[in-house]
Amino acid sequence: MDAQNKEVAALIEKIAGIQAAIAELPSLSPSPEVDRLFTDLVTACVPPSPVDVTKLSPEHQRMREALIRLCSAAEGKLEAHYADLLATFDNPLDHLGLFPYYSNYVNLSRLEYELLARHVPGIAPARVAFVGSGPLPFSSLVLAAHHLPETQFDNYDLCGAANERARKLFGATADGVGARMSFHTADVADLTQELGAYDVVFLAALVGMAAEEKAKVIAHLGAHMVEGASLVVRSARPRGFLYPIVDPEDIRRGGFEVLAVHHPEGEVINSVIVARKAVEAQLSGPQNGDAHARGAVPLVSPPCNFSTKMEASALEKSEELTAKELAF
């Protein structure tokens, strides 16, 4: 076995061991043991590695799928815990830095906006939808406060309790960012005419856990979004043990033109895919040598510097944020 194969085997074995330990936990609610295991997992998955999760053995693929579901459940419990904690403050939005990964949301949302601005010039959406917003809708909050100050945000989640927690966070800011936020308990598969109202739809990484589920969600969006509307999808190709991977071809088959694919460096975990609802002429096949229609993926570099190397301590606690980042 050559050195690279040994490295791949060692990493898969390590992650499988962490997955087994997480699966045996009596609860995924925040605790020292839960925090330790997930810190170990993220520390193992973030550095660049030669592992291609699409080529895992069936056994390891089942392990990966089980791990992603555990990550999803734990993330939900972590966000619910901190949503309840933040709700105890008179001004919850002044204390967002208490959440240990808040800085990651700041950087990810900035990245998504700058990719949109680069590939959809002049974009100034009146309404956007965020599908899979959860109890701590940090992404919508950062986008609304720092990048899209005139935009109305409709946040969708399957969980009514998650939406109730989110509403409490904005209750004290009804005349500010909160005035542009609404929360809806719904399955995206049940949305039809509503989707035609949005200039941009953001699809969270954990909406559609399996590849088939994700492709079905994207196809549904493609059937009901208006031509020219933008779709921002979170994927995780370099960190595919943490989140589902989205194949750009599934986005094309769903009726979209893929504008850009960005894989993260440093602290940002998720890959980002920016697409646009295609017009009928584009859906019929390649036109005038269109590279996107032929299937060429425009892999792009980051629009700003996100290449700072993450240190282990950043996984255990949030980096100290500037006053500007917390001023809502």
UniProtKB/Swiss-Prot annotation:
Q: Which organism is it from?
A: Hordeum vulgare
**Please, which domain of life does this record's source organism belong to?**
Eukaryota
What's the Enzyme Commission number for this chain?
A: 2.5.1.43
Protein's UniProt name:
Nicotianamine synthase 1
Q: Which residues form a coiled coil?
A: none
Q: What induces it?
A: By iron deficiency.
Tell me which InterPro entries the record gives. Nicotian_synth, SAM-dependent_MTases_sf
Gene3D superfamilies per the record? Answer: Vaccinia Virus protein VP39
> What's the gene?
NAS1
